[in-house]
From Swiss-Prot:
SUPFAM superfamilies per UniProt: FAD/NAD(P)-binding domain (SSF51905)
Alphabetical keyword list: Cytoplasm, FAD, Flavoprotein, Methyltransferase, Multifunctional enzyme, Oxidoreductase, S-adenosyl-L-methionine, Transferase, tRNA processing
Compartment(s): Cytoplasm
Region annotated tRNA (mnm(5)s(2)U34)-methyltransferase, chain positions: 1-245
The protein's name in its UniProt record: tRNA 5-methylaminomethyl-2-thiouridine biosynthesis bifunctional protein MnmC
Length: 666
């Protein structure tokens, strides 16, 4: 089974206090004046001070090889801040920095390295506060009130650039070609990297690098850049600068999963839950006009209306896509929730998943074999589990120390209120009945007889996403469930973490002295009627898993307090995020896909129609990243996920997988 942890950098600090890599026997930055060298080589070499004021797009994208200590990023961020202060009315409003790092520093080493540059402290402290765990793939950090986006890709750059989604092609405005010297790290400085840089560079993009090595210059020229030498910094004689003067036409791999956005920054979102709320915020951040249509009287009346929901990642013993997506989604969710300027009941108390029988123990053992960072997930024996959760369990398991619980109802309403302050238009008591394409717009028809017209539409209305002609074929299903609300007792109040078994039990919410226990599971059932049998079963599952635990007998469901909701799920347990696929056109165009992959056209979709749904039981974990992914896609901005995992979220994936194998789609 593949392991999902990245090896952190091993370094030491020399006599000058400069960090030195033990792996590459090279300094991370110059002993003389690393800060000034960065300004000269990368900011000056890319002429950023000249280009920022005349940039014709709201976003400027920089890509970098070798994040290291983050010196280049912090220096650029500082310069961008100065530019924004001096030019508040400029078209350029946001900075997007993409960087690759095979051996990321630990947070402690990062903080030590940053002590070198006190003038960068205001920016360095923000970076340290959000520094991600050593997990492979992309970590998106939203900084400076989301005016600066940092995508940290952990892994080998030559492998990662091959895994980038095609939507990133020809988007980069400037390249910082950095890293340890070619003589120290020859594996990085390859034709594969140079070709990837050219593929990602937009026409007119620039690059700069500290080296003047001939093979680097020739490799970049062969990739498509026009190169020239420039005087190097300080005692260095020369460095290299380049410009992408060609208009390359990159090959589109896997066109059946291609994603398209919109040039029109106006949309209608259908829904009223956490996904709709977070998507609204993500689009508003990018300058969109957003109108939210909700069938209910107020937000969070559907699956997002529970009093307490657990936050922890889904892991799988066999599905690589789940293991790539959910740990990244979880860490992004924690960063986003912590940064939101809103109040909602929550406690990051940890979540422990117990192995109460042989089958669950085997499942947990397989999850632990993923070798995730201990800060994300680690093993507990029976004694450690009882110490962690605070009650007798007599079995071990897996614990997620950064997990916990939150109130989805409060969070959803608070986020929509925040979005409303930022320009969101809300329309409640609007039940959408149909969507009709009219020229380049969508006409929305509501149960009341009212109509509305929008450039683009996002369906984020839970288990009702497949109620329309365009989405009816989507392979999703409803899952009804009931969560019981129980009063605390002295024994139950000892529970310190969210407890997961063949169900779940939350610690008490101190604001109402109640716990949540659940949840029943009824596939295909859309009923929201309270059921006495579900109430009884929620308690019985706890007793069955912990038959010797006296505290469990104090769970009292006789008050008949509960909440019934309906989730939307898929059989592969992954969300659906992206363009709404045209089912009939997909089957027609890809009828011979198994034999004609090389000549396949991009996936047939309904232009301007998107879906964000099928979040299942882990919506609190997946909704933040899914909203960010869709907002980036719709805005034609970099998407924070590799192409393979993105394909696993594509709404057409289940059909395309069969078509690729020459099987019939039913």
């Amino acid at each position: 089974m593949k392991q999902y942890a990245i090896q952190p950098a091993t370094l030491e600090f020399n006599a000058e206090g400069t960090p030195v890599s033990r792996d590459f026997d090279d300094v991370y930055f110059s002993n003389d004046n690393g800060l000034e060298e960065t300004r000269y080589v990368f900011l000056g070499g890319n002429r950023l001070a000249e280009r920022f004021p005349v940039h014709s797009h709201p976003l400027f994208i920089v890509a970098e090889s070798g994040f290291g200590t983050g010196l280049n990023f912090l220096t650029l961020w500082q310069a961008f801040d100065s530019f924004r202060s001096a030019h508040p009315q400029a078209t350029l409003q946001r900075l997007h920095f993409i960087s690759f790092e095979k051996f990321p520093l630990t947070r402690d080493d990062l903080a030590l390295a940053h002590q070198h540059w006190p003038e960068l402290a205001p920016w360095a402290e923000q970076l340290q506060a959000q520094w991600p765990l050593p997990l492979p793939g992309c970590h998106r950090l939203l900084l400076d009130r989301s005016r600066v986006t940092l995508d940290l890709w952990f892994g080998d750059i030559n492998e990662l650039t091959d895994q980038l989604d095609a939507t990133l092609n020809q988007t980069v405005d400037a390249w910082f070609l950095d890293g340890f010297a070619p003589a120290k790290n020859p594996d990085m400085w390859t034709p594969n990297l140079f070709n990837a840089m050219a593929r990602l560079a937009r026409p007119g993009a620039t690059l700069a690098t500290f080296t003047s090595a001939g093979f680097v210059r020739r490799g970049l020229q062969e990739a498509g850049f026009t190169m020239q030498k420039r005087k190097g910094f300080g005692r260095k004689r020369e460095m290299l600068c380049g410009v992408m003067e060609q208009h390359l036409m990159p090959t589109l791999y896997a066109p059946w999963f291609y994603r398209s956005g919109s040039e029109k920054r106006e949309t209608a979102i259908i829904g009223g839950g956490i996904a709709s709320a977070l998507l609204s915020l993500a689009l508003l951040r990018r300058g969109w006009q957003v109108t939210l249509y909700c069938a209910d009287d107020q937000p969070a009346q559907g699956a997002s209306g529970n009093r307490q929901g657990a936050l922890y990642p889904l892991l799988s013993k066999h599905d690589a896509a789940i293991n790539r997506f959910f740990p990244t989604a979880f860490t992004f969710a924690r960063r986003l929730y912590d940064a939101l300027p809103v109040s909602f009941d929550h406690d990051w108390c940890g979540v422990t998943q117990l192995g109460w029988d042989e089958k669950s123990q085997q499942k947990i053992a397989q999850m632990l074999s993923l070798a995730l960072p201990a800060e994300l997930a680690s093993a507990l024996n029976a004694e450690e589990a009882e110490q962690a959760v605070g009650v007798t369990t007599r079995c071990g398991g897996i614990t997620y120390p950064a997990g916990g619980w939150l109130c989805p109802e409060q969070l959803t309403r608070a986020v929509i209120a925040l979005a409303t302050e930022q320009g969101l238009q809300t329309r409640f008591r609007h039940t959408l009945t149909s969507l009709v394409a009219q020229e380049s717009r969508w006409q929305l028809r509501f149960m009341s007889g009212e109509t509305a017209s929008h450039e683009t539409v996002v369906l984020a209305n839970g288990h009702q996403i497949n109620r329309f002609d365009q989405t009816r074929p989507l392979p999703v299903y409803a899952v009804g469930g009931q969560v019981s609300h129980i009063p605390t007792t002295p024994a139950l109040s000892a529970l310190r973490q969210v407890l997961c078994y063949d169900g779940y039990l939350t610690p008490q919410n101190p604001h109402n002295q109640q716990h949540c226990i659940g949840a029943s599971y009824h596939r295909g059932d859309e009923s929201t009627v309270w059921r006495e049998e579900d109430q009884r079963q929620n308690r019985q599952r706890l007793l069955d898993c912990f038959p010797d635990a006296k505290w469990a007998t104090e769970v009292d469901v006789s008050g008949n307090s509960a909440r019934c909701g309906v989730r939307c799920a898929t059989r592969d347990h992954l969300p659906m995020v992206g363009n709404v696929p045209d089912y009939h056109a997909t089957l027609t165009h890809y009828a011979d896909l198994a034999d004609n992959k090389t000549s396949a056209a991009p996936a047939p979709v309904y232009p301007g129609l998107f879906v964000l749904g099928a979040l299942g039981s882990r919506g609190l974990c997946s909704a933040p990243l899914c909203a960010e992914i869709l907002a980036a896609q719709m805005s034609n901005e970099p998407i924070p996920l590799d192409a393979g995992t993105l394909a696993a979220l594509n709404p057409n994936r289940l059909w395309v997988r069969k078509l690729l194998k020459g099987k019939a789609v039913k």
